[in-house]
């Protein structure tokens, strides 16, 4: 397995798909990496030469934020939104969906498990 930026990339995949195993690299970024480095994106990882791997490593380390650095940046952005009290920050703080989804029936991922509320017993008047 080739190791790029501390992540093991599967050998049996083509290069375009294999790079998407790294957090922060999707299909479009992967295509841009192969275009800028001049490597064929349809070659399987097992057939990459050491020179190809080094080109990809250098390009990623100098041009793209990935893994821990990207996660930290996202975390700081969320903290900043919470501190300034914008709408998205408030939604993050109270644990509701941030991007405009309806919350009457769904959004269980953000709200957590259902909390059952006990009903009050009705008094019978005679």
UniProtKB/Swiss-Prot annotation:
The keyword rRNA-binding applies. One of its GO terms (cellular component) is small ribosomal subunit. InterPro entries: Rbsml_uS13_C, Ribosomal_uS13, Ribosomal_uS13-like_H2TH, Ribosomal_uS13_bac-type, Ribosomal_uS13_CS. GO terms for molecular function: rRNA binding; structural constituent of ribosome; tRNA binding. Residues 101-126 are annotated as: Disordered. The keyword rRNA-binding applies. GO terms for biological process: translation. It holds the Pfam family Ribosomal_S13. It comes from the Bacteria. Located at the top of the head of the 30S subunit, it contacts several helices of the 16S rRNA. In the 70S ribosome it contacts the 23S rRNA (bridge B1a) and protein L5 of the 50S subunit (bridge B1b), connecting the 2 subunits; these bridges are implicated in subunit movement. Contacts the tRNAs in the A and P-sites. Part of the 30S ribosomal subunit. Forms a loose heterodimer with protein S19. Forms two bridges to the 50S subunit in the 70S ribosome. NCBIfam families: uS13_bact. Belongs to the universal ribosomal protein uS13 family. This is Small ribosomal subunit protein uS13. It comes from Karelsulcia muelleri (strain GWSS). The lineage of its organism: Bacteria, Pseudomonadati, Bacteroidota, Flavobacteriia, Flavobacteriales. The gene is rpsM.
